[in-house]
Regions:
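Arg/Lys-rich, low-complexity, intrinsically disordered basic segments
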Residues: 1-98
């Protein structure tokens, strides 16, 4: 099971960063915008998913080193970060450490 490390973003304007087992850093999420883990609004979540699904982002396991994957699954899947981390482990077999 691959282990990814979740940290504060290193890129200006981004919220979080994940570091892959190979050491690749991916910054994601707007530092100023709110996400599902903040507002827990199902309508905003549906709108975000609809808008970003048209962008051709890879939300499957093969996209695990992309910002879109992490934004979708950590910030827009469950009402809390802890629940999102559990979801990622169950769905993709990826362990996320904070």
């Amino acid at each position: 099971m691959p282990i990814y490390k979740l940290e504060p973003a290193t890129a200006k304007g981004k919220r979080y960063s994940v570091v892959s087992p190979e050491g690749k850093r991916t910054n994601f999420g707007s530092a100023t915008g709110s996400t599902f883990i903040d507002h827990k609004d199902e309508q905003k979540k549906a709108a975000w998913i609809a808008r970003h699904s048209k962008a051709g982002e890879n939300w499957e396991y093969s996209g695990r080193d992309t910002a879109g994957f992490w934004a979708r699954h950590l910030l827009w899947s469950a009402p809390t970060l802890r629940q999102s981390i559990k979801y990622i482990k169950e769905r993709f077999g990826i362990k996320v450490r904070t």
